[in-house]
Design a protein with these regions (language model features):
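A short secondary-structure junction motif
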Residues: 89-96, 120-124, 128, 151, ...
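Short linear capping/connector segments at secondary-structure termini
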Residues: 130-137, 222
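N-terminal positioning helix adjacent to the helix-turn-helix/winged-helix DNA-binding module
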Residues: 35, 39-42, 171
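Helix-turn-helix
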Residues: 38, 46-80, 84
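Hydrophobic alpha-helical connector segments
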Residues: 84, 95-127
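Amphipathic alpha-helical packing segments from all-alpha helical-bundle domains
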Residues: 135-184, 196, 203
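C-terminal peripheral helix-coil segments that are non-catalytic and often amphipathic
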Residues: 1-20, 157-158, 188-244
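Secondary-structure edge/capping motif, primarily at the C-terminal ends of alpha-helices
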Residues: 97-101, 128-131, 185-190
């Protein structure tokens, strides 16, 4: 049952490898990869402490010890760094869910990824504010949708829930749009039942793929029972380096 997520992880790694290619098509050296990782880890740490608006290229330079020119060699701007961080966070989340839920179904793993992201946003205010910037950016949001399309494809291809390319895209757009709404709700003045909203999101995410209500109920119930696991995974994602 781990195979689908392993295939997915390879797909996301390939996306990362394409990012790491230089203009002549060669793969960057280990040293270049190390420098890029240092930039991303420093940016992630700053984002978690100060939020998106206060994290500047200058602060990333000071925190990472990497020269400004080197940062612009790898990334166009701060938004580009944030987009790369999100790619790594998704891959990290997938790996952790694969380790903790190896014997679970593709549907459960898909729901678990959604659950972990929303749980992190509910538990960490500064991360919540940073993610809202990402969701509000057309470029970054489009990248989020693309990542979730690849995740769904890796999980559901060759199953009864396999979709066409357009089907994967439409379903993912609905799910990520709903996740954006869940995130925005956390900033509303009215008191919010975040756990209830997350469960509604999971039901929608599974429902768009045609999952029957009885199976959805079972998955949601099990997701609810593993709250400690999601808290631990979320804490590791926020506090641990992206690239070791």
């Amino acid at each position: 049952m781990c195979l689908s997520l392993k295939v997915l992880d390879e797909g996301i790694k390939e996306m990362a490898r394409r990012v790491l290619k230089s203009e002549d098509g060669t793969i960057m050296s280990d040293h270049a990869t190390l420098i890029r990782g240092r930039i991303m880890n420093s940016a992630k740490e700053l984002l978690a402490k100060e939020g998106y608006s206060k994290t500047t290229i200058r602060k990333i330079v000071e925190h990472s010890g990497v020269l400004t020119g080197s940062i612009y060699y790898f990334f166009k701007n701060k938004e580009d760094i944030f987009r790369a961080i999100l790619l790594e966070l998704v891959r990290d989340c997938i790996n952790k869910i694969n380790q903790n839920c190896c014997d679970e179904s593709p549907l459960f793993k898909y729901a678990a990824v959604c659950q972990v992201e929303l749980k992190v946003l509910a538990d960490y205010k500064i991360v919540r504010e940073t993610y809202l910037e990402g969701y509000n950016s057309t470029i970054i949001f489009e990248g989020m949708v693309a990542q979730f399309v690849e995740m769904a494809r890796g999980l559901f291809d060759d199953t009864e829930y396999e979709c066409s390319d357009e089907g994967y895209y439409q379903n993912t757009l609905m799910v990520k749009g709903a996740m954006h709404a869940c995130l925005s709700e956390m900033f509303f003045r009215r008191e919010v039942d975040s756990a209830g909203t997350r469960e509604s999101l999971l039901r929608l995410a599974l429902g768009v793929f045609g999952v029957k209500e009885a199976e959805i109920n079972g998955i949601v119930e099990k997701i609810r029972s593993m709250n400690d696991t999601w808290e631990r995974i979320g804490k590791e994602m926020v506090e641990h380096p992206l690239v070791k």
